[in-house]
UniProtKB/Swiss-Prot annotation:
GO terms for molecular function: transmembrane transporter activity. The lineage of its organism: Eukaryota, Viridiplantae, Streptophyta, Embryophyta, Tracheophyta. Its main location: membrane. The chain crosses the membrane at residues 12-32, 42-62, 81-101, 105-125, 137-157, 187-207, 219-239, 245-265, 283-303, 308-328. It is a multi-pass membrane protein. This is WAT1-related protein At3g28080. It comes from Arabidopsis thaliana (Mouse-ear cress).
């Protein structure tokens, strides 16, 4: 009996941690949307917040288990991590710009097509094979099609309102800033940019898989990766905003709060992610990703006074179904591999989420 209670408590801790992690990530997107309306520029935001996150994660290097021997950090590995950092920078920049044009709900919905995009790229690069004789392969193809159809519906079909937001004044950030809703043209631009973001994420996952095979130390790779994002976004910001140096001065208002909160939550989220993946299969973490759509809808309604449109609802459902079908196909494929090649170690591609980018 005591063992069963202990098991339930353990599962409850995992469940709470994952829900808190997804909620915090969507919350950061909502907070960023508000802060940009108060003058926060994306480049100092990313530069400062990721620098803070890397500094907060640095002590973890002294507590991680280094019992296994690792290859030295060669120039080849460092260059690949640098490339991963560049791709990550493109990912967070396009993600931030996409949210500025649209809202966190669209960002969460489009974010769930990443497994489908990763599968497409893996087939193109011949890292995955499509065989319609295998259920797992059929599932991944069907899930990819569902996800892409859902993405097109979310972006191109607004539809009528199915829920009109009405939030209390003390929770409504629109009292503090200009209107945060997006026009139809901005929505389309935001959707296109967020789709490009998904492509960057998918390419990053493929590169990340190769890096982790050569240097399987997640904390070290992640800290260097996050630090690279801070450096690259700073360099891009200095070039793009060279005539506007005042953006690098942060005031003691919601902009500073957003940067500090993002840095802290990014580091904490990674710790939760690494802890969960150490005790659970990567599929367990993936199961919670579609919940970000629901969380974004709730937060957008409460804090941004966003309304829910039929297109977003239908597209979100299709994307969620496609997501789970792709993940089922990948899980079934990995299960078959383990049964057939029990003596070999395989690194999952779509299920590998050791450095889930933020």
């Amino acid at each position: 009996m005591a063992g069963a209670v202990s098991l339930w408590r353990r599962e409850a801790v995992f469940l709470t941690a994952m829900l808190a992690g997804e909620t915090s990530i969507v919350g950061l997107s909502t907070l960023f949307k508000v802060a940009t309306s108060k003058g926060l520029n994306i480049y100092p935001f990313l530069s400062y917040s990721y620098l803070l996150a890397s500094l907060l994660l640095l002590p973890s290097l002294f507590f991680t288990n280094r019992s296994r021997s690792l290859p030295p950090l060669s120039a080849s590995i460092l260059s690949k991590i640098g490339l991963l950092g560049f791709l990550g920078s493109m990912y967070v920049i396009t993600g931030g710009i996409g949210i500025e044009y649209s809202n966190p709900t669209l960002a969460s919905a489009i974010g769930n097509i990443v497994p489908a995009l990763t599968f497409i790229l893996a087939v193109i690069f011949r890292m995955e094979k499509v065989s319609f004789k295998e259920r797992s392969s059929v599932a991944k193809v069907m899930g990819t099609i569902l996800s892409l159809i859902g993405a097109f519906v979310v972006i191109f079909y607004h539809g009528p309102r199915v829920f009109v937001a009405s939030s209390p004044p003390y929770l409504n950030f629109r009292q503090l800033s200009p209107p945060l809703s997006s026009s139809k043209s901005d929505w389309l631009i935001g959707g296109a940019i967020l789709t490009i973001q998904g492509i960057f994420v998918s390419v990053s996952f493929i590169l990340q898989t190769h890096i982790m095979r050569e240097y399987p130390e997640a904390f070290t790779v992640s800290i260097l990766y996050i630090l690279c994002i801070s450096i690259v976004t700073s360099m891009i910001g200095l070039v793009v905003e060279k005539n506007n140096p005042s953006i690098w001065i942060i005031h003691f208002d919601i902009t500073l709060f957003t940067i500090v909160t993002t840095g802290i939550i990014t580091s904490v989220y990674y710790v939760i992610h690494s802890w969960a993946i150490r005790h659970k299969r990567p599929l367990y973490l993936a199961i919670f990703k579609p919940l970000s759509i629901l969380i974004a809808v709730v937060m957008g309604t409460i804090f941004l006074n966003d309304s829910l449109y039929l297109g977003c609802l239908i597209g979100g459902i299709l994307i969620t179904l496609g997501f789970y079908v792709v993940m089922w196909g990948k899980a079934n494929e990995e299960k078959n591999k383990l049964l057939s090649f029990s003596g070999k170690e395989k690194t999952p591609l779509l299920l590998s989420g050791k450095n889930d980018q933020i």
